[in-house]
A protein has these predicted regions:
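Catalytic core of Fe(II)/2-oxoglutarate
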Residues: 122-186
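Residues at beta-strand starts and edge strands
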Residues: 3-6, 93-95, 166-170
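Catalytic core of non-heme Fe(II) oxygenases with the double-stranded beta-helix
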Residues: 68-149
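Short beta-strand-to-loop capping motifs
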Residues: 11-14, 101, 174-176
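Short amphipathic alpha-helical surface micro-motifs
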Residues: 24, 51-61, 67, 78-82, ...
């Protein structure tokens, strides 16, 4: 019998890393302060990608060496650990690429197997996800600190634990013209 090895994450290098971080934070603070300040009761905020590109023009070419083009961005913002639960993103690709923007050192993205899930809808953004309904069979598989550009498998159960002494914790979660899951292969 074969056993399948699932790779949940992989750190990669991109061009203009710091410029993208600086531009994205500037965009969040000046153009969508309600998102930065998390005035809405949601953690997952799809961003206006064209407006974000005005602040992060290098985002268009940052992934050229991987032959993928970024075409969507989400700000994932937490002010405390109740803002993330074990969930599975309901996304048309198996992976996204996350860039740490603020206070990600000392935080963990934890991946799980098992559990029972139900589909829930974000009331603000109308996006769907699967949220843990039952701990039946749940166990930790692995974890990663998003301290650099990281491909993560969003179609597997995961959650984020932040350093409660440093908030907000913000990552930029990126989608592409083709699924970046191929970057998780050895």
């Amino acid at each position: 019998m074969f056993s399948v090895i699932v790779i949940y994450f992989k750190k990669i290098q991109i061009h203009s890393y710091q410029e993208i971080i600086d531009g994205a934070l500037n965009y969040l603070k000046t153009k969508v302060p309600d998102v930065y300040n998390r005035t809405h009761n949601t953690t997952y905020y799809p961003l206006d990608f064209k407006k974000l590109l005005e602040y992060c023009p290098k985002l268009e070419s940052a992934f050229d060496e991987y032959s993928i083009k970024c075409n969507m961005a989400v700000a994932y913002i937490m002010y405390n650990n109740t803002h993330s639960t074990i969930h599975i993103d309901k996304f048309h690709h198996d992976a996204r690429i996350n860039i740490p923007l603020l206070n990600c050192i000392g935080t963990k993205t934890i991946f799980f197997s098992g559990g029972e899930y139900e589909i829930v809808q974000n009331p603000l953004t109308k996006t769907n996800a699967k949220r843990l309904k039952s701990l039946n069979g749940i166990k930790v598989v692995t974890q990663v600190e998003i301290d650099d550009t990281t491909v993560i498998r969003v179609n597997e159960p995961h959650t984020v634990i932040m350093n409660a002494e440093q908030s907000p914790r913000i990552t930029l979660s990126l989608g592409f013209d083709k699924d970046p899951v191929f970057l998780l292969a050895d």
